[in-house]
Amino acid sequence: MFVAMLEWTQCAAVERVPGKVSGAWVFKSTRVPVRALFANLEDGATVNEFLTWFPGVTREEVEAVLEHAERSLTVA
């Protein structure tokens, strides 16, 4: 999975707090790891399903994470 290689400090929708979910990148003000979004999408889930399963995450945050990942992958 490519998520670990991205520079998440520039994405306002996520945070990394020592001691919170073992220091993993999570959606801001939640305990939902960013990797959960990508894992669910890889498994065939839709964004709507993800939002239903993780009600603390907003559509805007998911879109920001996906846009950040896309931009990060297109920068050489």
What residue spans do the PLM features occupy?
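Short, intrinsically disordered or compositionally biased N-terminal tails of bacterial proteins
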Residues: M1-A4
